[in-house]
Amino acid sequence: MTDSSHDGVPAPRRILLVTGLSGAGKSSILRILEDLGYEVIDNPPLGMMDEIVTRAEQPVAIGVDSRTRGFDAAAVLAALGRLRVNPDLQAELIYATAEESVLLRRYTATRRRHPLAMRGTVKEGIEAEIELTARLRAAADMVIDTSDLPPPELRQVVEMRFAPRHDRMAEGLTVALMSFAFPAGLPREADMVFDARFLRNPYYDPDLSVRNGLDQAVADYVASDPDYPRFLDQIDGMLGLVLPRFVREGKKYATIAIGCSGGRHRSVTLVEALARRLAAKNLAEPGGTCDSPGKPAHIEKGAAPTDVQSGGADAQGAWPIIVMHRELARQGRSSWRWASRPREHAADVVEGQYSS
């Protein structure tokens, strides 16, 4: 099982390293990936990772956490780095997390022992694991916060992001809008990248530096740049041209990335504004669905500004839209959310407990 290729060139084989906090849903993510056709290996010795990938003939999902023999964040990142230099592989790191209070509640409900709390409390084990895996969260390609995320929606976002092209649950195109920081590297999955570093930078305003683009004051500051409206219009116009062509090519998932210096102010503001535009166009389509900008489907901290700018709906279809802020997620300030939900769920999933 591989993703479809272009011009006869095989697509890189996907290798997913799934890590995170115990009780946050890592095992649930691995089960979903197994249903999608991935070869799943949970907690192999780190020294065997290269051999596992070499022998596998299909996409691989490898679970790695504090229970893994020889676990060390630096060793995991080194293994990931070795995989990424191989042009025949597309290696990505997924980090599952949840708020401490949620993890405590889950452990209380299941009466399971935390792997790092053999001689202490569950709370102490959670805190130790957060510290132990901090470098992995900071380097993750995708941080999934399951605090308020029902299992059916977890399945939905994993399927939309990681299913092979021919097996994606959405019939049409799913659009992911991502903010990121250029110094942290370009998002490997990005189909289009826009550079917002020429806009006014709130970082140099002491009152705004500690905030982010989800804050209305920061969004207003960025939007006050005289070139901001034109830049946003041109990105919107470019997507109006390109996204329908992606659909014609059979592409099922498109990642549009906007970057700035720190990934917290200008890029976040633009992604939020673009998400509102696309969601507003979805509402104009028959059967379109949109989450309220003031009530995101899932966001850890902060709320998107609520002004809505809408363009015409004739250039683009009513597509599911996911918003992800990579740097904010790595810092625990935000997670992914729907800006516009799929019209219907393709998977009939029963809600249940998360597995670590």
Curated annotation (Swiss-Prot):
Function: Displays ATPase and GTPase activities.
Positions of GTP binding: 65-68
Originating organism: Gluconacetobacter diazotrophicus (strain ATCC 49037 / DSM 5601 / CCUG 37298 / CIP 103539 / LMG 7603 / PAl5)
Cited Gene3D superfamilies: P-loop containing nucleotide triphosphate hydrolases
Region (Disordered) residue spans: 285-313
UniProt KW ATP-binding keyword: yes
GO MF assignments: ATP binding; GTP binding
UniProt keyword annotation of Nucleotide-binding present: yes
Record-listed ATP binding positions: 20-27
One Pfam family of this chain: PapZ_C
UniProt name for this protein: Nucleotide-binding protein GDI1189/Gdia_1902
Keyword line: ATP-binding, GTP-binding, Nucleotide-binding
Family: Belongs to the RapZ-like family.
